[in-house]
Amino acid sequence: MLNIIFIGAPGVGKGTQSALIEKDYSISHIATGDMLRENIANGTELGKTAKSYMDKGELVPDSLVIDMLKDRIKKDDCKNGFMLDGFPRTIEQAKELSNILESLNYKISAVIDIFASEEIIIDRLLKRGRADDNEETIKNRLKVFENQSKPVLDYYSDKAKIIKIESIGTPEEVYAKIKKELDVL
């Protein structure tokens, strides 16, 4: 069973690489944003509660996201393994995730830290053409990501294999580096 945490700044290629990993290793890709939207769309109790926060423009509390994640990881499609994208973002979330996984008798196999230079990320995001992707906003998002991700990586340093991948080259070249690391786990 391969259980992966995927950490990377906006624009480093997490989505592209996650899709390739999901396909090759037959593991479920769990993105917290998608999970929230799915719970809301399905009208689950957790989804209704999350929607009440979102409708007020508030952040959905960690405890609610954790509960959704626990329900999600228990599903049959996670029995072969899973990949978490966008979670955990903080030490508190990482500790809660550890508690969940321990209760289910699961372990994190690896944490993939995918990175690129600020210049490359800014260039990629500006080319993406989203309304909220301007240089100042991107730099702020990168600073927030950097401040949050380093402590999470430190937390996992003695709990799982940390795989550092520089996101330079074609998506296929980057994936070849990831696959080489995952195949020895």
UniProtKB/Swiss-Prot annotation:
Looking at the record's lineage, which domain of life comes first? Bacteria
Record's catalysed reaction(s): AMP + ATP = 2 ADP
Gene3D superfamilies documented for this protein: P-loop containing nucleotide triphosphate hydrolases
Residues noted as binding AMP in the record, renumbered to the chain: 32, 37, 58-60, 86-89, 93, 130, 141
Record carries keyword ATP-binding: yes
Keywords of the record, alphabetical order, are: ATP-binding, Cytoplasm, Kinase, Nucleotide biosynthesis, Nucleotide-binding, Transferase
The answer to whether the entry has keyword Amino-acid biosynthesis is: no
Pathways per UniProt: Purine metabolism; AMP biosynthesis via salvage pathway; AMP from ADP: step 1/1
Q: Which InterPro entries match?
A: Adenylat/UMP-CMP_kin, Adenylat_kinase_CS, P-loop_NTPase
Q: Where is this region: LID?
A: 127-133
Instruction: Quote the entry's note on domains.
Output: Consists of three domains, a large central CORE domain and two small peripheral domains, NMPbind and LID, which undergo movements during catalysis. The LID domain closes over the site of phosphoryl transfer upon ATP binding. Assembling and dissambling the active center during each catalytic cycle provides an effective means to prevent ATP hydrolysis.
According to its UniProt record, which protein family does this protein belong to?
Answer: Belongs to the adenylate kinase family.
Q: How does it assemble?
A: Monomer.
Quote the protein name from its UniProt record. Answer: Adenylate kinase
